[in-house]
C-alpha cells in the first residue's frame, strides 16, 4: 500500500510540476520531476516588476548577507563568534545605507529605478538602531540586489558588492 501511495504521489507531483512550467535550459528532470534551478534564474524585467518592492528586498537581503558571509570567510581565519559579529555589523541598516550612498554614482538608470522603488516602499517597522532614512536606503539596496539576482545578473551584483566593500564599513 505504501509503495502504491508513493508512486501515485510521485505521479501527481510530476504532473503538477510539468503542467506548471515548461522545460527550459535552467530546468532538469530528476527522478521523474521537473526541477527548476533557483540558483540561475533569469527573469524578464516585466516579471520582476510584478514582484513587490519589499518582496525584492526580501530576496536581496539574503543575497547581500550571503555575499558578506562569503567575503568574510574568504578574508581570513575568524572564529564563528567573530564571523557572526562581523556579518551583523555589515548587514545592519546603517552599514547598508552607507554602502548604498557609495553605490549610487555607479548605478545605471534602470538600476537606480529599482533602488528608488525599494527606497520609497512603505515599511511598517523600523529597527531601533536605524533612522527612517537609513532603513529606506538599506531597503533600496536590498531591492536592487534582489532584482539583479532574479534577472540573473550575478556579475553586476558582484561588481557592485566588491566596489562598495573596498572602503571600511560604518559602525
What are these regions (language model features)?
Residues 5, 9, 13-171:
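Double-stranded RNA-binding/processing signature
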